[in-house]
């Protein structure tokens, strides 16, 4: 090939590359529906590396969205924050952790005490150290000691992990898990990414305030308890959107309550706006109405 021909080929390749660079990359679809996100069931479980020795874990649960766990690999052991919703699912998770490290599980943080995060905990080592709020200890009937305050620091073999109680939110005992050096906050069920606010055990208005506290922490990446793990910028945007969803649900239910509707009629007439497209809206919408009615009427304990 002559020098002139080579130059023409190079110019052609460079021009094509510049054209490709100018075409915007399709934005990641923001949804909790796996198929809309481009996933197949066979893509799960997924282990997502968040930082050196820090991993998110997503697996599909019924009725078809993800439950998310966190695990941290230290020099001498592993910390898990939230498990999965059955013995079978937890066995699968422990198997995936074993692909990353042969170190034993030494610590377990109860982010949520609900069964979809704890039903497989019988597979944890008998000498595992639990980190749990007094409320969740009571719910799970654990013999392990509860946290004495709102913060417990765990040294996971050289990695600082903080279990933080920011207040009542999805339950009365939610813990979030903060890694200050990595600027990661695993939020358990305080953050349900693109999943309609699930309020069976919730404190709706307090939940909004807990997210305010989370947003004030020095965090680059917020990791949800359900829905998909996002890249850092999108994770903050989605947490803010989730807080907007909570506020919208509370406002709409207050409107219906002021109109004199019963909770049953309010659930039928509620207009959830853009959040009607979110996962679980049919199941969780009526529950949210009842819970906000309890809050309005002073019946929330």
Residue ranges and their predicted role:
Residues 208-261, 265:
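Divalent-metal (often Zn2+) His-rich catalytic cores of metallo-beta-lactamase-fold enzymes
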Residues 9-22:
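Bacterial N-terminal signal peptides
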Residues 25-27:
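Boundary at the C-terminal end of the N-terminal hydrophobic targeting segment
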Residues 47-96, 175-179, 184-187:
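Conserved beta-strand hairpin/beta-sheet module of binuclear metal-dependent hydrolase folds
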Residues 258-301:
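C-terminal regulatory/interaction regions
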Residues 31, 49, 133-167, 171-173, ...:
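Metallo-beta-lactamase
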Residues 88, 95-156:
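Active-site HxH/HxHxD metal-binding segment of metal-dependent hydrolases
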Residues 81-83, 106-114, 131-135, 185-188, ...:
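Active-site neighborhood of phospho(di)ester-bond hydrolases with catalytic His/Asp-centered motifs
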């Amino acid at each position: 090939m002559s020098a002139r021909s080579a130059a023409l080929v190079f110019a052609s390749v460079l021009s094509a590359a510049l054209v490709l660079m100018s075409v915007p990359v399709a934005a990641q679809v923001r949804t909790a529906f796996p198929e809309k996100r481009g996933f197949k069931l066979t893509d799960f479980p997924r282990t997502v590396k968040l930082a050196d020795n820090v991993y998110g874990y997503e697996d599909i649960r019924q009725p078809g969205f993800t439950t998310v766990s966190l695990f941290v690999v230290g020099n001498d052991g592993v910390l898990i924050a939230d498990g999965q919703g059955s013995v079978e699912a937890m066995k699968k998770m422990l198997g995936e952790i074993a692909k990353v490290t042969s170190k034993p599980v030494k610590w377990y943080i109860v982010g949520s005490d609900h069964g979809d995060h704890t039903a497989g905990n019988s597979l944890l080592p008998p000498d595992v150290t639990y980190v749990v709020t007094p409320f969740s200890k009571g719910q799970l009937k654990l013999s392990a000691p509860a946290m004495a305050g709102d913060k417990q620091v765990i040294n996971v073999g050289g990695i600082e992990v903080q279990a933080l109680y920011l207040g009542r939110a999805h339950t009365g005992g939610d813990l979030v898990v903060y890694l200050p050096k990595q600027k990661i906050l695993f939020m358990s069920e305080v953050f349900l990414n693109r999943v309609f606010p699930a309020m069976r055990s919730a404190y709706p208005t307090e939940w909004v305030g807990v997210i305010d506290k989370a947003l004030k922490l020095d965090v680059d990446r917020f990791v949800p308890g359900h829905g998909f793990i996002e890249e850092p910028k999108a994770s903050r945007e989605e947490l803010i959107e989730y807080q907007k969803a909570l506020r919208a649900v509370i406002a709409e239910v207050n409107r219906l309550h002021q109109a004199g509707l019963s909770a049953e009629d309010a659930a039928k007439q509620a207009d959830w706006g853009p959040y009607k497209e979110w996962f679980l809206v049919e199941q969780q919408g009526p529950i949210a109405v009842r819970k906000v009615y309890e809050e309005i009427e002073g019946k929330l304990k």
